[in-house]
Amino acid sequence: HLYIDRIDLCVFGNTQPFRVRMVNRINDNFDYFYIKNADASRVYGLELEDLLSPNRISYLVHQNTLIEEHIAGIPGEKFMRLHMSDPNLNPIRLAKEFVKFNERCFVRLLGDMHSSNFVVDVTPDFEETHYRIRAIDFDQQCYEAKKSIYLPQYFKENNALIQLGMDVITPESMRQYQREERALIATRVKSSHTELEDILQTMESDQLAPQSHVDQLKTELAKHYQTKDFLKCSSMGEILRKSLSLVSR
């Protein structure tokens, strides 16, 4: 009772995936799926998203082909362009979610989270509106050399959310939200210890990025966290293991 209604070539980004529209013949309900190249960083990124974020995600891999489910939400660029002036917007909740999203990306080293690579999931409640910012592209997991690439706060495309945070939350509140998110990540690390250990061991033996990227990132993180332990790392997998260990202290 399922059939493929349409296949689109998505020309945005650097991967140009196919978007497949699957329709239920019985009730005309439909879902989208994306067909992409199954590069290592993207697969690791999907696994870490499922284990370490508050979001669940499903995908299939066969040889060099990856099939991802569609992640529902308003594209970040569109949300900032059309919804920031909504009178029903809850600025504090939205700013808080951006701080927490920023922290999630940095701790698990997911890079390139500008407004084209995430969506905003808006959930109205009986009193307030809740927001969840979700990554939709994972090909920059543990690849980039610069620390700033793993922090969404440094992308000019995200300036509307960055400015909102500066306007409505204090530095003290921001640090509180960061601590909250790191505590949640620590809980997820413990609850998925076996699966995460398998992934980290595989990543440590895999070459995810040029050695120059590894050397620059471990140096910048050693300075950021004020610990020389990062300097002992020889791969992106080892850097990620060290980053995750810091939230569990």
Language-model-derived ranges and their functions:
Residues 86-147:
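Conserved kinase catalytic-core segment
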Residues 43, 52, 104-114, 161-164, ...:
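Short secondary-structure transition/capping segments
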Residues 78-85:
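AlphaC helix of the protein kinase catalytic domain
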Residues 1-78:
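Conserved ATP-binding subdomain of kinase catalytic cores across diverse folds
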Residues 59-62, 76-78, 102-111, 141, ...:
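Noncatalytic linker/hinge segments flanking ATPase motor cores
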Residues 61-64, 86-87, 95-98, 161-165:
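Short, surface-exposed, polar/charged, turn-prone segments marking secondary-structure boundaries
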Residues 127-249:
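C-terminal catalytic region of ATP-dependent kinase domains
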Residues 50-53, 64-69, 100-101, 163-172:
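Short C-terminal domain-edge/linker segments immediately following a structured domain
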